[in-house]
Amino acid sequence: MRSNHALALALAMLSGFGLGAIAIQGLHAQGTKVGAYVIVDITQINDPTIFKSLLLKEPQAVEAFGGRFVARTNYITGHDGVAPLRFVVIAFDSVQKAKDWNDSAAQTEINAIRMKSTTSRSFIIETDGIK
């Protein structure tokens, strides 16, 4: 009986490693370069009705500048410190594209909605210099 559990565990681990390798290969095959991430950290939603309008507008504004959502979720587990209520990570090919998106008319409107309906902060993280 014990050997059956060990065999099942070994097969599960091999499957996990194989699936992980395939996923990583798929990401590299896409050739997607990430030069910047936009991080939005929402600690409180003050007006859910207004906030919902942001959720509907945001994807089109991001896609218009070549951005890709990496995470857009309320499901966050705190590790160190208090986890935010909602967290958004958006990848852009360059810092300039992230800045252009943030300065666009559509995103300026979305940022105003976010600031009015939430307690939050957002920032751009440059990845070009990471070695």
Where are these regions (language model features)?
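Short S/T/G/P-rich N-terminal loop/turn motif that feeds into the first structured element of a domain
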Residues: 16-86, 91-100, 126-131
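Bacterial N-terminal signal peptides that target proteins for export
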Residues: 1-13
